[in-house]
């Protein structure tokens, strides 16, 4: 619950006019020091699409506050929920990409000065390809590929926070 509060997650129950499509979805705000710059909505059940954004909004890195908390390394996750798990639950600085197809070239400049950048890639073809692509852009990248069908969230539920800390320590 503390992680949800820190991430300022909410559920849309009484939407504003024109936002009825977000009812009963998890609201995930994109926060900066200036305030909310975007909100994405995730289905709580099996509704499709799983994720929805505000009409006309552009994509951003999620959890940019991690840049101010990180020291020599930072992690990248696929998606907001995995980022919340790694950063707010495991206390490992992480930013998130809202889907591997939403990576923007200028993000590499934000990550270039870290000694190490760890990509916790999902255990699917998209995660594998994302790791290969990002490795061409970031010389300081270390890809930690999840097993087939796994991601940060499922690995946390199975192995706990120490799993990620050990992966990072073993790669340094």
Regions found by a protein language model. Give the residues of each.
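Conserved beta-strand segments of alpha/beta enzyme cores
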Residues: 93, 140-142
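A charged alpha-helical hairpin associated with nucleic-acid processing machineries
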Residues: 70, 144-147, 162-172
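Short, acidic/turn-prone active-site loops that include or flank metal/cofactor-
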Residues: 97-103, 122-125, 146-149
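Acidic beta-strand-to-loop metal/phosphate-binding motif
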Residues: 76, 114-126, 145
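Short, surface-exposed amphipathic charged segments that create phosphate/polyanion-binding patches used
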Residues: 109-114, 153-165
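Switch/connector loops and helix/strand junctions flanking conserved nucleotide-binding motifs
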Residues: 127-129, 154
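Phosphate-handling DNA/RNA-contact segment within nucleic-acid enzymes
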Residues: 2-115, 130-131
């Amino acid at each position: 619950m503390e992680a949800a509060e820190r991430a300022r997650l909410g559920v849309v129950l009484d939407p504003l006019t024109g936002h009825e499509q977000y009812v009963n979805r998890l609201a995930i705000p994109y926060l900066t020091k200036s305030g909310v710059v975007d909100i994405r909505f995730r289905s709580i059940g099996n509704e499709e699409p799983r994720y929805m954004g505000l009409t006309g909004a552009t994509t951003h890195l999620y959890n940019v506050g991690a840049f101010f908390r990180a020291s020599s390394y930072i992690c990248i996750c696929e998606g907001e929920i995995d980022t919340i798990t790694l950063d707010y639950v495991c206390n490992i600085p992480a930013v998130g990409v809202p889907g591997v197809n939403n990576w923007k070239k200028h993000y590499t400049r934000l990550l270039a000065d870290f000694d190490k950048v760890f990509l916790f890639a999902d255990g699917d073809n998209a995660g594998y390809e994302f790791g290969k692509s990002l490795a061409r852009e970031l010389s300081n990248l270390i890809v930690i590929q999840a097993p087939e069908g796994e991601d940060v969230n499922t690995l946390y539920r199975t192995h706990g926070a120490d799993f990620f800390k050990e992966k990072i320590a073993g790669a340094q």
